[in-house]
UniProtKB/Swiss-Prot annotation:
Protein name as catalogued: Probable zinc metalloprotease UREG_01421
Residues given in the record as Zn(2+) 2 binding sites: D196, E232
UniProt keywords, alphabetically: Glycoprotein, Hydrolase, Metal-binding, Metalloprotease, Protease, Secreted, Signal, Zinc
Family recorded in the similarity comment: Belongs to the peptidase M28 family. M28B subfamily.
Entry note: cofactor: Binds 2 Zn(2+) ions per subunit.
Length: 503
């Protein structure tokens, strides 16, 4: 009995090891165009796991990465690293953008930064033939006994590119324009915040500029480009923005924050210029899913198939190609240890959200007083501070392209199917599914697809087209794989998959 258990355990370990080895996504990729020839050229799927191909099936076909449309390729080609650099340098020029800094000086402090960001968005709006609208929204934050010692105005700058067919379906990106130094409440010292987070604001600005141009078709769904304040003091601006949308019952089907996306170089000098991390949360907060829903999710093994992780899978399928020249390293957790970001308030409001961050971080260039220190042992001098000289502007432009590929694909594909269920009324070796159309109905939907993967595979490996049906039975046991249902547009664009719950 002992030897049999050992053999089974060994076999299980070997299978799991081979699967993880086959599906591993290493962070270090000096040239992803060479490291990922299949994904970037449309060959065999990178989302497969050869060691996890059991159970065998003859139905469906391999799930392939989604290729960018002609319009998307044109958009990606116009994202400019020089404009991104100019935006970051301008934001740094305000001296400090600390949330508690002056809001009345025209050239210094967070108020000047806010007004400049709004003026840039408005300049793009003026050139957009009425497509882009700009709002500055905010509220008075009272002292919190911690990082807000006195009342302060928190302002978010929001540019909206309204969709043509489904304007009520929204996708949003943000960066935070406030900055800080070592002392989180020091609002007078020079706080350049080039990487954290002028880089993310520059991405929002550049995508708004490019996507709102009149010669591009407007997206089917609405895109929002935001710059928020108060992140360093407690995610205040993002929380206000998320609550504003939630109070309007807005249908936000995806949100991304770009926070610290300015450099590809680690503190030891390691460079990884073609990788960006994407953090996707597992179990939603209990304020979003109640205890019964959570217990059901855990019972069916759906903890890795939350809306945030489905959104992250979509990004990987749409944003890894030769036009972005990037690999998306999906990290299955909310955020880094001891850190937080502006996607969290959106998750807490019930919206799918994820965070983009550079592959390696140099903490000498984050949350630091600008200074030079000499190592007493080596005599070498070390520069501290979040200065623009440590930014890689071409890298930031590539991160912008990843965002653009995801946003444009999301906005031009159908929304997520609703009420996705799998029948559990009887014991059966097949799987029967039911679903309702997306919130916007079947307008623009060209069909539905059932996707699946091994329970140990990170990404969808198989797909089956079932046409316009709203129920389908698959000759594959729901006990052995993870399923999802997604809509496909008449334009061929595939949407985000949804995990079926028992019915």
């Amino acid at each position: 009995m002992h030897s049999l258990s050992s053999a089974l355990a060994g076999s299980t370990f070997v299978l799991l090891f081979l699967c993880l080895l086959a599906s591993a996504q290493p962070l270090t990729t000096p040239n992803p165009a060479r490291a990922l020839p299949d994904a970037l050229t449309g060959g065999s799927s990178i989302f497969s796991c050869p060691a996890a191909s059991w159970p065998p099936t003859r139905i469906g076909s391999p799930n392939r990465p989604q290729r960018p449309s002609r319009e998307l390729r044109s958009i990606l080609s116009q994202i400019s690293h020089k404009r991104i650099e100019a935006s970051i340098l301008k934001l740094v020029s305000f001296g400090t953008r600390h949330t508690l800094s002056t809001q009345t000086n025209a050239t210094h402090g967070i108020g000047a930064a806010r007004d400049w960001i709004a003026s840039e968005f408005k300049r793009y709006a003026d050139a957009s033939d009425g497509r882009l609208s700009v709002d500055v929204i905010g509220y008075e934050q009272q002292p919190d006994g911690n990082r807000i010692p006195f009342p302060v105005r928190i302002s978010d700058v929001v540019a909206t590119l309204k969709g043509t067919e489904e304007p009520e379906r929204i996708y949003l990106i943000s960066g935070h324009y406030d900055s800080r130094v070592t002392d989180v409440n020091d609002y007078t010292s020079f706080a350049p915040g080039a990487n954290d987070d002028a880089s993310g604001v520059a991405v929002s600005l550049e995508l708004a500029r490019v996507m709102s141009q009149p010669h591009f078709p407007r997206p089917r769904a609405t895109l929002v480009f935001a710059a928020v304040a108060g992140e360093e003091q407690g995610l205040y601006g993002s929380r206000f923005l998320a609550e504003t949308y939630r109070n309007k019952s807005a249908n936000i089907e995806g949100m991304f924050t770009n926070d610290i996306v300015g450099s590809s170089t680690a503190d030891d000098g390691t460079r990884d210029p073609h990788v960006v991390r994407l953090f996707g949360q597992g179990l939603p907060p209990l304020t979003v899913e109640d205890q019964k829903q959570r217990e059901t999710r855990l019972t069916i093994g759906g903890e890795n198939d939350t809306p945030a992780r489905q959104l992250s899978r979509f990004v990987k399928e749409t944003a890894e190609n030769e036009h972005t020249d990037m690999r998306v390293s999906v990290i299955y957790r909310l955020d880094r240890y001891l850190r937080g970001g502006d996607h969290r308030p959106f998750l807490e409001a019930g919206y799918p959200a994820a965070r983009f961050t550079e592959p390696h971080e140099n903490f000498a260039h984050q949350h630091q007083d600008v200074r030079v220190e000499t190592d007493p042992k080596t005599g070498r001098k070390k520069q501290y501070g979040d200065l623009p000289e440590f930014c890689d502007f071409r890298y930031i432009a590539r991160v912008g392209k990843v965002n653009a590929a995801a946003l444009w694909s999301l906005a031009n594909s159908p929304g997520m199917p609703r009420n996705v269920r799998v029948s559990t009324r009887d014991l059966s070796n097949d799987s029967k599914f039911f679903w309702d159309p997306p919130v916007g109905g079947n307008e623009g939907v060209g069909g539905y697809e059932i996707v699946w993967r091994s329970t140990v595979a990170p990404f969808w490996t198989h797909v089956l087209d079932v046409g316009m049906a709203r129920e389908a039975t698959v000759d594959l046991s729901k006990d052995n794989v993870i399923f999802g249902i997604r809509a496909r547009g008449k334009n061929g664009e595939r949407g985000v998959a949804v995990l079926p719950f028992p019915a």
